[in-house]
């Protein structure tokens, strides 16, 4: 590629503002342009980089048995209605009707469609296991696009899906994907942490995220440096203290005027927060199959010294989205904001943390202005509809595995894998005949990587004050050839010859043949960030050597013209070998072995 004819120009400064310096560099390097909120166009350099990333994905997925397919972005809504996600997913799922009035969706993920295909293509256990994958543009109407490619509305996604006869087969596939993901990210040059995560709207029994640690990330992780435990905050468990076990005492009402917070309550009564119960009032909107929207009121209770985890609450009540109840809604169930508890309320789903359920004689709201109750006990004073872990893990909490302190870190999720089990196959009737002739639901897994988000994280990781420093495996070109004279000169003739010989040797070259000052060309080479730069000018002709510069290290060397091609081929091979050396098997966490 010659820069004199390249579509798209480098920029001295990035248009607009972004909290991601990597995103600013992608714009300055003529990789992409923003065309709308959360919507981007890739220019030739950026799209070539995306294709390099996709090549890594294809190679590793095919290595573990994946077969590439292409599924439609437009899905019949009926498939999504059969699984229920049409009704539980909010406005981020784009819904529309065709001219015949049929409901359709723009699929932001393809569990329904691939299950439909599995139902039609897999008949017997002899056809299992199978795995398919695709690389496709998707749309999710995200309400808060941010940080360039990190949070967008339209995006390129690699999604893969596996079919197995049973949970043991799925566990084997899950382990293979876990290892393949680590290989993919290392081959691309991105350090990631694999952490337990919430299954979210995907459903299933187990999920892991692959997270790039960065201060600009939206995800909060809980990490134990002692034993290696790591989880997204939405799914993180921790070692909870032992509950109080004193015998039930008599329920007693006590005046607490103005004590509408746990802090005020503990100060007024002189009790520790650990002996109080905190009420959280939430609401979930549920759309029925007739598209009637009903609102479910939820009252969650955690210990006063802890915080509620809305994701865990939503999982227990099977609600995709929760919102705070209004004061009017709180009154409707017989509660009082600031003095609320499940005691005496009606028309509400009560969700209680396991530690509260096991504790005795807590202080809780009396559902009367200025009043609380002493000695509240679950089972006697109110009944829980759901009991489980609904508290949020925090820095300093005890690791559930080893008891050491947890710490927090921020990061960006670049990939996620799920054990779906039979959720979708059961809903859509995707079955196979086993060896005994019995019909059984297919056991499924799904595995996704955000390709654009991966590029964004690579730009964040591989940069300096001058520009990008892209790994050789994903850089749009391997060599930046810079001519510091006009094309008709002796230096120009040498540069053209080197350009042709490099391409003939299989080296991908971006040739800066523009009529520009040397400073402009060097600045552009730095911001684009190809692994190696070759400079040829009048001094090169006089010395009989070209300057070769490593972008990552900044080290330069004079290489005779008759050795330039061989030297660059050698250096590219060495850069690839350095990356390959990072691809080593790792010990997998115990949870991925469980069927």
Swiss-Prot record:
Record keyword Ligase present: yes
PROSITE patterns: AA_TRNA_LIGASE_II
Pfam family, one: tRNA_edit
Subcellular location, record wording: Cytoplasm
Keyword ATP-binding: yes
Annotated GO biological process: prolyl-tRNA aminoacylation
Its biological purpose: Catalyzes the attachment of proline to tRNA(Pro) in a two-step reaction: proline is first activated by ATP to form Pro-AMP and then transferred to the acceptor end of tRNA(Pro). As ProRS can inadvertently accommodate and process non-cognate amino acids such as alanine and cysteine, to avoid such errors it has two additional distinct editing activities against alanine. One activity is designated as 'pretransfer' editing and involves the tRNA(Pro)-independent hydrolysis of activated Ala-AMP.
Description of its domains: Consists of three domains: the N-terminal catalytic domain, the editing domain and the C-terminal anticodon-binding domain.
Protein name per its UniProtKB record: Proline--tRNA ligase
The gene coding this protein: proS
